[in-house]
Design a protein with these regions (language model features):
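Catalytic-site microenvironment of enzymes
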Residues: 1-253
Length: 253
């Protein structure tokens, strides 16, 4: 038996070697280029008003409560899509405009969506609209204190903000079937002072009987939240698919 063991061991070694040779070699997958900004690091949701600042009111219905409810719903939906989210407030407390924009500027690559509901001078005013901060038209505008380089650099940002507003507005109309009041350019503080694509949503008129009746239902507020989530996602998909161009600096001859 002792003389047979070396031969038996040699046989096992041979079989193992043959089996090893038949196995496929290590797989080296083709490197896939990482798309910059595959997902925004942060989607900042800004429920308007809060604390002593109730916003628009209709009886006991307060804008600050509606904005927080919609923001919490939108946050969950965005997280389910794989986005990281931040809320400028997650309870009934006052947050200054400066604090809100600071949170919006914290991440290097993010989106900012401020959520509001309208207060119309006419009871007949109704519908949904979305704002973005376009480039100031003249030297007396909001950005007049910026250098010329900074003003020119704000143009791509304004275009991205307009895209975000457009996608959110389209989703709002699609989801709620509300009157489409379109997208508009305004230098509202919270969106004009964020260094990333930003939009401000007006999800209906608290001063309109039809609008406020719908806003008191969880189903309708869920539709608004879904529209915000849809709009953010569609904007990001469109932005992700855009070709990235590398511009070479001109060399003096």
């Amino acid at each position: 038996m002792r003389r047979a063991l070396p031969w038996f061991g040699l046989l096992l070694l041979t079989i193992s070697f043959v089996r090893l040779v038949r196995l496929p070699g290590p797989i080296h997958p083709t490197p896939v280029p990482v798309v910059r900004g595959e997902r925004p690091l942060v989607v900042v949701l800004d429920p308007g008003h809060g604390g002593a600042d109730s916003g628009a009111m209709c009886g006991t219905i307060m804008e600050k409560d509606l904005t927080l409810d919609v923001a919490l719903r939108a946050e969950l939906l965005l997280r389910l899509k794989g986005y990281t989210t931040v809320l400028t407030r997650d309870n009934d407390r006052y947050v200054s405009l400066a604090e809100r924009t600071a949170m919006g500027n914290h991440a290097d690559d993010s989106l900012f969506v401020s959520i509001h509901f309208n207060d119309g001078q006419r009871a007949a005013a109704s519908g949904v609209e979305t704002y973005y901060a376009g480039q100031s038209a003249g030297p007396a505008g909001f950005f007049s204190w910026l250098s010329s380089w900074q003003r020119s650099a704000s143009t791509p940002l304004a275009a991205k903000s307009e895209s975000l507003a457009r996608f959110i507005q389209a989703a709002l109309v699609e989801r709620t079937r509300a009157l489409n009041r379109g997208i508009k350019s305004e230098q509202f503080y919270v969106i004009a002072n964020v260094r990333h694509p930003a939009a401000l949503v007006e999800g209906g008129f608290i001063t309109n009987k039809s609008d406020v009746t719908k806003l008191t239902t969880t189903e309708y507020r869920q539709q608004i939240a879904m529209a915000i989530s849809d709009g953010v996602h569609r904007h990001w998909e469109a932005r992700r698919d855009e070709p990235t161009l590398t511009l070479a600096a001109a060399r003096p001859e």
